[in-house]
Curated annotation (Swiss-Prot):
Protein name, UniProt field: Tryptophan synthase beta chain 1
E.C. number: 4.2.1.20
Disulfide bridge map: none
InterPro entries: Trp_synth_b_CS, Trp_synth_beta, Trp_synth_beta/beta-like, TrpB-like_PALP, TrpB-like_PALP_sf
Sorted UniProt keywords: Amino-acid biosynthesis, Aromatic amino acid biosynthesis, Lyase, Pyridoxal phosphate, Tryptophan biosynthesis
Complex and partners: Tetramer of two alpha and two beta chains.
Annotated signal peptide: none
Cofactor(s) it depends on: pyridoxal 5'-phosphate
Pfam families, A to Z: PALP
Family matches, as SUPFAM superfamilies: Tryptophan synthase beta subunit-like PLP-dependent enzymes
GO BP: L-tryptophan biosynthetic process
The keyword Magnesium belongs to this UniProt entry's keyword annotation: no
Enzyme class: lyase
Length: 389
């Protein structure tokens, strides 16, 4: 069925939003066939964002694990993460649709920075909604967004994190449909957003496939990526679905799955409806969306993209989780072994290397972003303070 991945996805939104989603779908279907759009998009990815990103052979990490480990270096993109791929695509689409105002939600701030960057590039007004809790955790990104000309609105309702920021952005969109384009930052939300975001991010997997064939002469045994909403994982996995490569999505295990303080929707969630989409949602016995926890602001989300729900159900991708402490260990390990400071989100994928037997295997880890934004929260974390004294 259109707009669904198996039983997941759809458009579970107020009636007032349906015309906007229909307008967006029609515009997107039009640009899918427009070669000039894709030329402009790809030129910007190359000349402005810095694609293709390298597939880097991590020599010392490989020696430690007895494997051949490659890092897909999305951290080297302009603004420091994979989010810019989608932001450029959607803001360009908004411009073609005649919109003048851009809004977005952000958790770790990376999508907010990327959207503010793209809005500045195209000369558009920009408002970013961010949970108040996240504005404290990610202060440098808040300052960046303001410098880029965006208005940052701290959201004080609910758990004051990503899901609340999305709620506020949706309220804004409903009020300003004529002028405003809502840039969703992950493969979540109502149709057609999950498909749009995945298609703007699949460049990651397409490049990876070409690069690994050049370097190894074959496809990898494993590809590992972190999963919050799931856009970096969808971007690298999509070109490898049904290729024989073992694909592993790593969720935020927080303080442990048994504690309830985590953000592992696919492992511990139930089927429900969140932000316009049918997917796996962390909810209580009454169906109320639960408060999530992760050391990483970008994975702190109580749902997950519907395509991931479908991949989980069909066994096309394996999903697991690592804890805050395991991710912090991986953050320090990559910094010390390779001189690369990873984002806390990406550190969850790196931490998974300890959980599987990869001896003699070729493994690609999607290094979705850099860790500058996380330095303060990592260095102030009691678990880390003991380890790097």
């Amino acid at each position: 069925m259109k707009g669904y991945f198996g039983p997941y996805g759809g458009q579970y939104v107020p009636e007032i939003l349906m015309p906007a989603l229909e307008e967006l779908e029609a515009a997107y279907e039009e640009i899918m066939k427009d070669e000039s759009f894709w030329k402009e998009f790809n030129d910007l990815l190359r000349d402005y964002a810095g694609r293709p990103t390298p597939l880097y052979f991590a020599r010392r990490l490989s020696e430690k694990y007895g494997a051949r480990i490659y890092l897909k270096r999305e951290d080297l993109l302009h603004t420091g993460a994979h989010k810019i791929n989608n932001a450029i695509g959607q803001v360009l689409l908004a411009k073609k649709m005649g919109k003048t105002r851009i809004i977005a939600e952000t958790g770790a701030g990376q999508h907010g920075v990327a959207t503010a960057t793209a809005a500045a590039l195209f000369g558009m007004e920009c408002v970013i909604y961010m949970g108040e809790e996240d504005t404290i955790r990610q202060k440098p990104n808040v300052e960046r967004m303001k410098l880029l000309g965006a208005k940052v609105v701290p959201v004080k309702s609910g758990s004051r994190t990503l899901k609340d920021a999305i709620n506020e952005a949706l309220r804004d969109w409903i009020t300003n449909l004529q002028t405003t384009y809502y840039v969703i930052g992950s493969v979540v939300g109502p149709h057609p957003y999950p498909i749009i975001v995945r298609n703007f991010q699949k460049v990651i997997g397409e490049e990876t496939k070409k690069q690994i064939l050049e370097k190894e002469g074959r496809l990898p045994d494993y590809i590992v990526a972190c999963v919050g909403g799931g856009s970096n994982a969808a971007g690298i996995f999509y070109p490898f679905i049904d290729s024989g490569v073992k694909l592993i999505g790593v969720e935020a295990g927080g303080e442990g799955l048994e504690t309830g303080k985590h953000a592992a929707s696919l492992l511990k969630g139930k089927i429900g409806y969140l932000h316009g989409s049918k997917t796996f949602v962390l909810q209580d016995d009454w169906g109320q969306v639960q408060v999530t926890h992760s050391v990483s602001a970008g994975l702190d989300y109580s749902g997950v993209g519907p395509e991931h729900a479908y991949w989980r159900e069909t066994g096309k991708v394996l999903y697991d989780a690592v804890t805050d402490e395991e991710a912090l260990d991986a953050f320090i390990e990559l910094s010390r072994l390779e001189g690369i400071i990873p984002a806390l989100e990406s550190s969850h994928a790196l931490a998974y290397l300890k959980k599987i037997n990869i001896k003699g295997k070729v493994v690609v880890v999607n290094l979705s972003g850099r860790g500058d934004k996380d330095l303060e929260s990592v260095l102030n974390h009691p678990y880390v303070r003991e380890r790097i004294r």
